[in-house]
């Protein structure tokens, strides 16, 4: 899509857009920065309102999948396919500015005995990110032809179960039984 096609419905000229943005990628970068900043704020608020880190982490990944494959899935598909490095740079910049919410949740889960105490939060975050990236940015799971939610249940959800103590597993089972009903 050209910049002209982007701005025409808004009644803007391309000259106006180029006054503020060097090119289409710069415009997309600024839009992504606003978008992911808003998502980060929502997640921070979501995390603060939760007393159970295991459930909060599960909800986070389920919401992310809904976003990537929901009403705007074509946008995210194209973004993941054509601009993965741009998307990564924006996400990394935003998460460097904000506290590492996921790391804090994992540490809280360890303290509250939801997660096993020998775990390393930094490694857990990396693995979850790799699993999520393999679901959203590769063709690895397309040939299976299952919904993204089912794929998530068989990857990240299973990984989270492996991190849990008996207490954490009880909470997860209660949570899953409540959302399946």
Predicted regions and their residues:
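Phosphate/oxyanion-binding loops and surfaces in catalytic or ligand/nucleic-acid-binding neighborhoods
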Residues: 63-71, 97, 131-138, 161-166
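Amphipathic alpha-helical packing segments from all-alpha helical-bundle domains
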Residues: 86-114, 122-137
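Hydrophobic alpha-helical connector segments
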Residues: 30, 43-71, 125-128, 152
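Amphipathic alpha-helical segments used for helix-helix packing
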Residues: 67-88, 103-104, 172, 176
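Short, basic, alpha-helical segments at the C-terminal edge of helix-turn-helix-like DNA-binding modules
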Residues: 32-40
């Amino acid at each position: 899509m050209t910049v002209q096609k982007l701005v025409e419905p808004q009644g803007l000229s391309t000259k106006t857009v180029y006054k503020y943005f060097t090119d289409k990628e710069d415009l997309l970068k600024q839009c992504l920065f606003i978008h992911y900043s808003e998502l980060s704020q929502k997640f921070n608020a979501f995390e603060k309102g939760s007393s159970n880190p295991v459930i909060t982490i599960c909800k986070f990944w389920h919401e992310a999948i809904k976003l990537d494959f929901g009403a705007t899935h074509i946008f995210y598909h194209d973004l993941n396919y054509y601009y993965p490095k741009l998307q990564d740079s924006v996400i990394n910049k935003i998460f460097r500015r904000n506290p590492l919410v996921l790391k804090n949740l994992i540490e809280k889960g360890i303290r509250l005995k939801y997660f096993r105490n020998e775990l390393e939060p930094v490694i857990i975050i990396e693995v979850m990110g790799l699993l999520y990236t393999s679901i959203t940015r590769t063709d690895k799971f397309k040939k299976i032809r299952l919904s993204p939610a089912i794929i998530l249940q068989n990857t990240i959800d299973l990984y989270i179960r492996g991190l849990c103590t008996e207490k954490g597993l009880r909470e997860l089972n209660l949570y899953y039984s409540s959302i399946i009903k």
